[in-house]
Amino acid sequence: MSKKLTFQEIILTLQQFWNDQGCMLMQAYDNEKGAGTMSPYTFLRAIGPEPWNAAYVEPSRRPADGRYGENPNRLYQHHQFQVVMKPSPSNVQELYLKSLELLGINPLEHDIRFVEDNWENPSTGSAGLGWEVWLDGMEITQFTYFQQVGGLQTGPVTSEVTYGLERLASYIQEVDSVYDIEWAPGVKYGEIFTQPEYEHSKYSFEISDQVMLLENFEKFEREAKRALEEGLVHPAYDYVLKCSHTFNLLDARGAVSVTERAGYITRIRNLARVVAKTFVAERKKLGFPLLDEETRIKLLAEED
Protein backbone atom coordinates (compact mmCIF):
# COMPACT_ATOMS: atom_id res chain seq x y z
CA MET A 1 0.00 0.00 0.00
CA SER A 2 1.33 3.45 -0.85
CA LYS A 3 -0.68 6.38 0.51
CA LYS A 4 -2.39 5.65 3.81
CA LEU A 5 -5.91 6.97 3.55
CA THR A 6 -7.47 8.79 6.48
CA PHE A 7 -10.72 7.46 7.93
CA GLN A 8 -12.75 10.06 6.09
CA GLU A 9 -10.87 9.41 2.84
CA ILE A 10 -11.79 5.73 3.14
CA ILE A 11 -15.44 6.74 3.41
CA LEU A 12 -15.17 9.14 0.47
CA THR A 13 -13.47 6.48 -1.67
CA LEU A 14 -16.17 3.91 -0.92
CA GLN A 15 -18.92 6.45 -1.53
CA GLN A 16 -17.51 7.36 -4.94
CA PHE A 17 -16.98 3.72 -5.92
CA TRP A 18 -20.47 2.54 -5.03
CA ASN A 19 -21.99 5.69 -6.50
CA ASP A 20 -20.31 4.68 -9.76
CA GLN A 21 -21.98 1.25 -9.46
CA GLY A 22 -25.41 2.89 -9.37
CA CYS A 23 -25.98 3.15 -5.62
CA MET A 24 -27.80 6.08 -4.08
CA LEU A 25 -25.77 7.69 -1.31
CA MET A 26 -28.02 7.81 1.73
CA GLN A 27 -27.24 9.45 5.07
CA ALA A 28 -27.04 7.76 8.46
CA TYR A 29 -30.50 7.17 9.91
CA ASP A 30 -31.22 9.30 12.98
CA ASN A 31 -32.17 6.59 15.47
CA GLU A 32 -29.92 4.41 17.61
CA LYS A 33 -29.35 0.97 16.12
CA GLY A 34 -26.99 -1.94 16.63
CA ALA A 35 -26.10 -2.40 12.96
CA GLY A 36 -26.48 -0.82 9.54
CA THR A 37 -28.83 -3.66 8.62
CA MET A 38 -31.42 -2.21 10.99
CA SER A 39 -31.63 1.06 9.09
CA PRO A 40 -34.92 1.32 7.18
CA TYR A 41 -32.73 1.80 4.09
CA THR A 42 -31.88 -1.90 4.42
CA PHE A 43 -34.53 -3.53 6.62
CA LEU A 44 -37.54 -2.13 4.78
CA ARG A 45 -36.07 -1.87 1.30
CA ALA A 46 -34.77 -5.45 1.25
CA ILE A 47 -38.36 -6.73 1.16
CA GLY A 48 -40.93 -6.43 -1.58
CA PRO A 49 -40.36 -6.51 -5.35
CA GLU A 50 -38.95 -3.01 -5.91
CA PRO A 51 -35.29 -2.53 -6.87
CA TRP A 52 -33.04 -0.72 -4.40
CA ASN A 53 -29.37 0.18 -4.53
CA ALA A 54 -27.99 2.27 -1.69
CA ALA A 55 -24.80 2.92 0.26
CA TYR A 56 -24.35 4.78 3.53
CA VAL A 57 -22.25 5.09 6.67
CA GLU A 58 -24.09 3.92 9.78
CA PRO A 59 -22.84 4.58 13.33
CA SER A 60 -23.80 1.43 15.22
CA ARG A 61 -24.29 1.34 18.99
CA ARG A 62 -23.70 -1.82 21.02
CA PRO A 63 -23.80 -0.87 24.71
CA ALA A 64 -22.53 -4.24 25.93
CA ASP A 65 -19.36 -3.81 23.84
CA GLY A 66 -18.34 -0.55 25.53
CA ARG A 67 -14.97 -0.68 27.32
CA TYR A 68 -14.63 2.85 28.74
CA GLY A 69 -12.36 3.87 25.86
CA GLU A 70 -9.61 1.58 27.16
CA ASN A 71 -9.80 -1.42 24.83
CA PRO A 72 -8.07 -0.84 21.46
CA ASN A 73 -10.62 -2.91 19.52
CA ARG A 74 -13.92 -2.99 21.45
CA LEU A 75 -16.27 -0.04 21.14
CA TYR A 76 -19.66 1.13 22.37
CA GLN A 77 -20.14 2.72 18.96
CA HIS A 78 -18.43 1.78 15.73
CA HIS A 79 -19.00 2.76 12.11
CA GLN A 80 -20.17 0.52 9.30
CA PHE A 81 -20.20 1.29 5.59
CA GLN A 82 -23.32 -0.40 4.31
CA VAL A 83 -24.02 -1.37 0.70
CA VAL A 84 -27.36 -2.94 -0.19
CA MET A 85 -28.26 -3.96 -3.75
CA LYS A 86 -31.54 -5.44 -4.97
CA PRO A 87 -31.59 -7.40 -7.16
CA SER A 88 -28.10 -8.57 -6.28
CA PRO A 89 -25.64 -8.12 -9.16
CA SER A 90 -23.98 -11.38 -10.19
CA ASN A 91 -20.52 -9.82 -9.80
CA VAL A 92 -20.97 -8.23 -6.38
CA GLN A 93 -17.94 -10.04 -4.93
CA GLU A 94 -15.78 -8.83 -7.82
CA LEU A 95 -17.03 -5.30 -7.22
CA TYR A 96 -16.12 -5.61 -3.56
CA LEU A 97 -12.56 -6.69 -4.39
CA LYS A 98 -12.26 -3.71 -6.76
CA SER A 99 -13.30 -1.42 -3.91
CA LEU A 100 -10.46 -2.83 -1.79
CA GLU A 101 -7.99 -2.07 -4.58
CA LEU A 102 -9.10 1.56 -4.55
CA LEU A 103 -8.35 1.61 -0.83
CA GLY A 104 -4.80 0.48 -1.61
CA ILE A 105 -5.30 -3.22 -0.88
CA ASN A 106 -4.19 -5.41 -3.79
CA PRO A 107 -6.02 -8.77 -3.58
CA LEU A 108 -3.06 -10.45 -5.32
CA GLU A 109 -0.70 -9.37 -2.55
CA HIS A 110 -2.86 -10.26 0.45
CA ASP A 111 -4.61 -13.27 1.92
CA ILE A 112 -8.29 -12.47 1.35
CA ARG A 113 -10.70 -15.22 2.34
CA PHE A 114 -14.46 -15.56 2.21
CA VAL A 115 -15.31 -17.63 5.29
CA GLU A 116 -18.83 -19.05 5.43
CA ASP A 117 -20.80 -17.43 8.23
CA ASN A 118 -24.54 -17.53 7.67
CA TRP A 119 -26.19 -14.50 9.24
CA GLU A 120 -29.19 -14.23 11.52
CA ASN A 121 -30.79 -11.39 13.46
CA PRO A 122 -33.40 -12.95 15.79
CA SER A 123 -34.76 -9.60 16.98
CA THR A 124 -35.87 -8.62 13.46
CA GLY A 125 -36.75 -12.07 12.11
CA SER A 126 -34.02 -11.81 9.47
CA ALA A 127 -31.53 -14.33 8.08
CA GLY A 128 -29.40 -15.04 5.05
CA LEU A 129 -26.48 -16.85 3.49
CA GLY A 130 -23.31 -15.09 4.47
CA TRP A 131 -19.55 -14.90 4.48
CA GLU A 132 -17.07 -13.06 6.61
CA VAL A 133 -14.25 -11.51 4.61
CA TRP A 134 -10.88 -11.97 6.26
CA LEU A 135 -7.92 -9.81 5.25
CA ASP A 136 -4.61 -11.31 6.36
CA GLY A 137 -6.39 -12.99 9.27
CA MET A 138 -8.64 -10.10 10.36
CA GLU A 139 -12.36 -9.84 9.64
CA ILE A 140 -13.12 -6.60 7.79
CA THR A 141 -16.45 -7.21 6.04
CA GLN A 142 -19.66 -9.23 6.24
CA PHE A 143 -21.33 -10.40 3.02
CA THR A 144 -24.98 -11.47 3.17
CA TYR A 145 -27.56 -12.61 0.66
CA PHE A 146 -30.84 -12.02 2.46
CA GLN A 147 -33.27 -14.93 2.46
CA GLN A 148 -35.67 -13.54 5.03
CA VAL A 149 -36.24 -10.06 6.46
CA GLY A 150 -38.91 -9.24 9.02
CA GLY A 151 -40.16 -12.81 8.71
CA LEU A 152 -40.82 -12.35 4.97
CA GLN A 153 -39.06 -14.27 2.21
CA THR A 154 -37.05 -11.91 0.02
CA GLY A 155 -37.45 -11.72 -3.72
CA PRO A 156 -35.60 -10.60 -5.69
CA VAL A 157 -32.50 -11.51 -3.68
CA THR A 158 -30.84 -8.60 -1.90
CA SER A 159 -27.09 -8.55 -1.31
CA GLU A 160 -25.58 -6.66 1.59
CA VAL A 161 -21.94 -5.70 2.02
CA THR A 162 -21.00 -4.34 5.44
CA TYR A 163 -17.49 -2.93 5.85
CA GLY A 164 -16.19 -2.55 9.40
CA LEU A 165 -14.62 0.88 8.96
CA GLU A 166 -12.54 0.92 12.15
CA ARG A 167 -10.98 -2.47 11.39
CA LEU A 168 -10.38 -1.53 7.78
CA ALA A 169 -8.78 1.78 8.75
CA SER A 170 -6.61 0.10 11.41
CA TYR A 171 -5.28 -2.24 8.76
CA ILE A 172 -4.75 0.42 6.09
CA GLN A 173 -3.01 2.80 8.50
CA GLU A 174 -1.10 -0.03 10.24
CA VAL A 175 -2.11 0.91 13.79
CA ASP A 176 -2.86 -1.47 16.67
CA SER A 177 -5.49 0.70 18.36
CA VAL A 178 -8.58 2.25 16.80
CA TYR A 179 -7.83 5.35 18.86
CA ASP A 180 -4.64 5.89 16.83
CA ILE A 181 -6.51 5.95 13.52
CA GLU A 182 -6.11 9.25 11.68
CA TRP A 183 -9.68 10.46 11.12
CA ALA A 184 -8.59 13.55 9.18
CA PRO A 185 -5.16 15.09 8.68
CA GLY A 186 -3.79 15.84 12.14
CA VAL A 187 -6.85 14.54 14.03
CA LYS A 188 -6.84 11.11 15.68
CA TYR A 189 -9.90 8.92 16.23
CA GLY A 190 -9.23 8.95 19.97
CA GLU A 191 -9.28 12.75 20.10
CA ILE A 192 -12.88 12.59 18.89
CA PHE A 193 -14.26 9.44 20.46
CA THR A 194 -12.37 8.51 23.64
CA GLN A 195 -14.52 10.76 25.85
CA PRO A 196 -17.91 9.62 24.46
CA GLU A 197 -16.74 5.99 24.62
CA TYR A 198 -15.91 6.41 28.32
CA GLU A 199 -19.12 8.29 29.13
CA HIS A 200 -21.44 5.93 27.26
CA SER A 201 -19.75 2.92 28.86
CA LYS A 202 -20.12 4.40 32.33
CA TYR A 203 -23.76 5.20 31.64
CA SER A 204 -24.56 1.78 30.16
CA PHE A 205 -22.87 -0.27 32.88
CA GLU A 206 -23.27 1.90 35.98
CA ILE A 207 -25.63 4.86 35.73
CA SER A 208 -28.64 4.01 33.54
CA ASP A 209 -31.99 3.95 35.34
CA GLN A 210 -33.26 0.39 34.95
CA VAL A 211 -36.80 1.21 36.04
CA MET A 212 -37.01 4.06 33.54
CA LEU A 213 -35.65 1.84 30.75
CA LEU A 214 -38.18 -0.90 31.53
CA GLU A 215 -40.99 1.65 31.45
CA ASN A 216 -39.66 3.14 28.22
CA PHE A 217 -39.63 -0.26 26.54
CA GLU A 218 -43.30 -0.74 27.38
CA LYS A 219 -44.17 2.76 26.14
CA PHE A 220 -42.21 2.38 22.90
CA GLU A 221 -43.82 -1.01 22.23
CA ARG A 222 -47.31 0.42 22.77
CA GLU A 223 -46.60 3.38 20.52
CA ALA A 224 -45.26 1.14 17.74
CA LYS A 225 -48.48 -0.88 17.86
CA ARG A 226 -50.58 2.29 17.84
CA ALA A 227 -48.77 3.59 14.76
CA LEU A 228 -49.20 0.24 13.01
CA GLU A 229 -52.93 0.30 13.68
CA GLU A 230 -52.98 3.49 11.59
CA GLY A 231 -50.81 1.99 8.86
CA LEU A 232 -47.90 4.30 9.74
CA VAL A 233 -44.92 2.11 8.94
CA HIS A 234 -42.02 4.50 9.41
CA PRO A 235 -43.06 5.97 12.79
CA ALA A 236 -43.77 2.41 13.96
CA TYR A 237 -40.34 1.24 12.87
CA ASP A 238 -38.72 4.17 14.66
CA TYR A 239 -40.26 2.84 17.87
CA VAL A 240 -39.11 -0.69 17.07
CA LEU A 241 -35.57 0.71 16.87
CA LYS A 242 -36.11 2.48 20.19
CA CYS A 243 -37.30 -0.80 21.71
CA SER A 244 -34.19 -2.54 20.40
CA HIS A 245 -31.77 0.06 21.77
CA THR A 246 -33.59 0.18 25.11
CA PHE A 247 -33.34 -3.60 25.36
CA ASN A 248 -29.61 -3.41 24.56
CA LEU A 249 -29.15 -0.90 27.39
CA LEU A 250 -31.05 -3.18 29.79
CA ASP A 251 -28.99 -6.14 28.64
CA ALA A 252 -25.71 -4.27 29.16
CA ARG A 253 -26.84 -3.31 32.67
CA GLY A 254 -27.61 -6.94 33.50
CA ALA A 255 -31.22 -5.99 34.16
CA VAL A 256 -32.80 -8.90 32.28
CA SER A 257 -32.52 -12.61 33.01
CA VAL A 258 -31.86 -15.24 30.35
CA THR A 259 -35.57 -16.08 30.23
CA GLU A 260 -36.62 -12.42 30.11
CA ARG A 261 -34.05 -11.77 27.40
CA ALA A 262 -35.68 -14.28 25.07
CA GLY A 263 -39.06 -12.71 25.79
CA TYR A 264 -37.89 -9.20 24.90
CA ILE A 265 -36.31 -10.41 21.66
CA THR A 266 -39.57 -12.13 20.72
CA ARG A 267 -41.54 -8.94 21.38
CA ILE A 268 -39.21 -6.89 19.17
CA ARG A 269 -39.30 -9.55 16.45
CA ASN A 270 -43.11 -9.66 16.47
CA LEU A 271 -43.24 -5.89 15.98
CA ALA A 272 -40.63 -6.01 13.20
CA ARG A 273 -42.63 -8.66 11.36
CA VAL A 274 -45.80 -6.57 11.43
CA VAL A 275 -43.82 -3.55 10.23
CA ALA A 276 -42.41 -5.57 7.32
CA LYS A 277 -45.82 -6.89 6.24
CA THR A 278 -47.40 -3.45 6.54
CA PHE A 279 -44.60 -1.84 4.54
CA VAL A 280 -45.07 -4.21 1.60
CA ALA A 281 -48.85 -3.71 1.74
CA GLU A 282 -48.45 0.07 1.72
CA ARG A 283 -45.99 -0.06 -1.20
CA LYS A 284 -48.48 -2.20 -3.11
CA LYS A 285 -51.20 0.42 -2.52
CA LEU A 286 -48.82 2.94 -4.08
CA GLY A 287 -48.36 0.61 -7.05
CA PHE A 288 -44.73 -0.29 -6.25
CA PRO A 289 -43.51 3.01 -7.79
CA LEU A 290 -39.83 2.06 -8.07
CA LEU A 291 -40.58 -0.79 -10.49
CA ASP A 292 -40.36 -0.17 -14.22
CA GLU A 293 -43.78 0.26 -15.78
CA GLU A 294 -43.95 -3.10 -17.58
CA THR A 295 -42.93 -5.11 -14.51
CA ARG A 296 -45.20 -3.08 -12.26
CA ILE A 297 -48.31 -3.65 -14.39
CA LYS A 298 -47.55 -7.36 -14.75
CA LEU A 299 -46.93 -7.86 -11.03
CA LEU A 300 -50.01 -5.96 -9.90
CA ALA A 301 -52.15 -7.90 -12.38
CA GLU A 302 -50.80 -11.21 -11.04
CA GLU A 303 -51.42 -10.23 -7.41
CA ASP A 304 -54.96 -9.07 -8.14
From Swiss-Prot:
The protein's Enzyme Commission number: 6.1.1.14
Gene Ontology BP terms: glycyl-tRNA aminoacylation
Gene Ontology MF terms in the entry: ATP binding; catalytic activity, acting on a protein; glycine-tRNA ligase activity; transferase activity
Xref: Pfam families: tRNA-synt_2e (PF02091)
SUPFAM superfamilies: Class II aaRS and biotin synthetases
Locations listed in the record: Cytoplasm
Top-level taxon of the source organism: Bacteria
Any one annotated GO CC term: cytosol
Record field: catalytic activity: tRNA(Gly) + glycine + ATP = glycyl-tRNA(Gly) + AMP + diphosphate
Alphabetical keyword list: Aminoacyl-tRNA synthetase, ATP-binding, Cytoplasm, Ligase, Nucleotide-binding, Protein biosynthesis
Similarity-based family: Belongs to the class-II aminoacyl-tRNA synthetase family.
HAMAP family (alphabetical): Gly_tRNA_synth_alpha
Subunit structure: Tetramer of two alpha and two beta subunits.
Protein known as: Glycine--tRNA ligase alpha subunit
Lineage, uppermost ranks: Bacteria, Bacillati, Bacillota, Bacilli, Lactobacillales
Gene: glyQ
